[in-house]
Curated annotation (Swiss-Prot):
The keyword rRNA processing applies. GO terms for cellular component: cytosol. Residues 84-109 are annotated as: Insert. It holds the Pfam family GidB. S-adenosyl-L-methionine binds at residues 115, 120, 171-172, 185. It is found in: Cytoplasm. GO terms for molecular function: rRNA (guanine-N7-)-methyltransferase activity. This is Ribosomal RNA small subunit methyltransferase G. Keywords: Cytoplasm, Methyltransferase, rRNA processing, S-adenosyl-L-methionine, Transferase. Specifically methylates the N7 position of a guanine in 16S rRNA. The lineage of its organism: Bacteria, Pseudomonadati, Spirochaetota, Spirochaetia, Spirochaetales. The gene is rsmG. Belongs to the methyltransferase superfamily. RNA methyltransferase RsmG family. Its main location: cytoplasm.
Length: 254
């Protein structure tokens, strides 16, 4: 990454970022806080990148479009899933006799970002949920490389991401059967080992949210999913200013 060019024009960066947030349909009341958090995140990326080799982009626009906006392009699917769970919790609470008991039965919504690397999509999603005021969503960023975890711990502190924890671990050794959603952008091809590893992280009835490219390129992966007898669907993602095709592959754990 050319660090001399990266974020050299904050106004330009903000323009692209804010337009992207608007095109994604994110609540405009959250734009100010979210854009501030994301700009700090990008500045920290610039500062650490030369030593930590976090991300390869040619300029600030590519960083915003191909990584920040791409990470946020699936936000509605995450958000709707948290609301579906919230509705079920509210229904269960309504059946309890004691209000205090009802409050105690509410549980956070857990999201894991497996192989998060520099924090994509986990950090943008964490910043989004904080900006939306949804503090019940908890994110775990799973990364095996110590230097990247050091960077992520710094990001957590600087951005005050109180909804986020950093787990230095291989995905295979991370907490099992814990997460409502397990997401990742890191794996190019989904094979049987990776699929099982990700499923092991999810709760029963939990879901995998996998960022993928063109639909025809994931046909081989969906054949594997069919053989495993899993329910799945593919959703098209519209990433502002990105000319490449993007999809979200959603797989449900039995």
């Amino acid at each position: 990454m050319d660090t001399d060019k990266l974020l050299s024009k904050d106004l330009l960066s903000n323009g692209i970022l804010l337009k992207g947030l608007k095109e994604l349909g994110i609540n405009e009341k959250a734009h100010n806080k979210l854009s501030k958090l994301l700009n700090i995140y990008m500045r920290e990326l610039k500062m650490f990148n030369a030593s930590f080799n976090l991300v390869k982009v040619k300029d600030d626009e590519e960083l915003i479009v191909a990584h920040i906006l791409d990470s946020l392009s699936a936000w509605r699917f995450f958000y709707n899933e948290t609301k579906n769970t919230e509705s079920k919790t509210s229904l269960n609470n309504a059946e309890t006799k004691n209000t205090n008991e009802a409050l105690l039965t509410s549980e956070p919504f857990y999201i894991a970002d497996a192989g998060t690397g520099a924090g994509f999509p986990g950090v943008p999603l964490a910043a989004l949920f904080i900006s939306l005021g949804n503090l019940d969503v908890k994110l775990s960023l799973i990364e095996r490389m110590q230097k990247r975890c050091t960077f992520l711990e710094n990001i957590k502190a600087v951005l005050q991401l109180n909804n986020t924890e950093i787990i230095e671990s291989e995905a295979e050794k991370a907490p099992q059967n814990k997460f409502d959603i397990v997401t990742c952008r890191a794996f190019h091809t989904l094979d049987k080992h990776i699929l099982q590893t990700l499923l092991n992280l999810a709760k029963p009835k939990g879901k995998l949210f996998l960022y993928k490219a063109a639909k025809e390129k994931i046909n081989e992966e969906t054949e594997l999913i069919k053989k495993e007898g899993l329910n799945y669907k593919t959703e098209k993602l519209d990433v502002p200013f990105l000319k490449k095709e993007r999809h979200l592959l959603i797989i449900e754990k039995p």
